[in-house]
Amino acid sequence: NLLNTRYIIVSPEALPLQNRFALGNAWFVERATLVENADAELLAIKTIDPATEAVVDRRFADQLTVVEQPGSETDTIYLTSYRPNLLTYEARLSADRIAVFSEIYYPYGWNAFIDDKPAGHFRTDYVLRGMVVPEGTHTITFRFEPRSYKTGNRISLAGSSILLIMLLYAALSALKTRRKNV
């Protein structure tokens, strides 16, 4: 349900079963329960309703500016664009709320933005992404921008530039030699 599994395939011969309890690509919870560590997080998940409550490791407490906020029927969040390295959501909220995203939390390279401004995100329910979204209408974006990729691109650009300079030098040297011999 947390990972938005919409269909369950029991056997190849049978029709897939629809999972009516899948929570969707993202949803708002009414409260967050802070726990001491990952082990406590795993234990606490068994005791909550993930549609209304999230479990958060205490080391992410500084990013959790809202711990409890009752829901509103008008609050919505939708996935509007999905690419492997870019996820875009549209959200409308009547108050600051905690959003849980049905995506695996991986802090190395994933950056979060609200209206193109950097925003913090944290691990919730042991494996998912969570974020406090402020009141109002917002575009939320998650971009995969790993440092290793950027560093590799810079090294490739430098290497290609050096190679190009060497090729130009060799071509100019050959041209000079040819002109002297003629």
Report each predicted region and the residues it spans.
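Short, cationic low-complexity segments
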Residues: 32-51, 169
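A cross-kingdom signal targeting lumenal/periplasmic-facing segments of multi-pass membrane
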Residues: 1-36, 66-73
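Active-site-proximal, structured, solvent-exposed surfaces of multi-pass membrane proteins
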Residues: 6, 52-182
